[in-house]
Amino acid sequence: MMTYEEKVRFLKSYRIAKENAETYLRQINDLRETMLPSGIHYTDMPKHPNYEDQMAKYAGEFWELQKKLERVQKKQLQVIAVINQIAEIDPLGHRILTERFIYNTKVEAICKTCYIGRKTEWVHRKKAIERLKI
């Protein structure tokens, strides 16, 4: 059975992985814009001496970012699997967690309300019980 600290660690690592993925996606989009400014096709771009070198450099950076993004997304899937294990271990306490995860699709909502800081598992479980009674 997972301890409270282990749950906290996994949820924090998911949040960090998500932030990294967003950063990498932003960098990839910036690179795309740098490679091909909007409205201009690459064949229409003026050929300057370093054109091929520049494109090769951008392609290399793009590929590296793509690989980093894949690794981060793999990490997210691993942590989601652990979140599902938590649900199996403590289904009543995890009910709100699961609902928030499905409907908001925001991991921040899970982390802030449930495990990072202030609220204990007991408060969380108590809220779940109250919600089931309604």
PLM segments and residue spans:
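N-terminal interaction/assembly modules
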Residues: 1-87, 134
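Short amphipathic alpha helix immediately N-terminal
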Residues: 88-103
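Short alpha-helical "recognition helix" segments of helix-turn-helix
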Residues: 109-114
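DNA major-groove recognition helices of helix-turn-helix
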Residues: 121-132
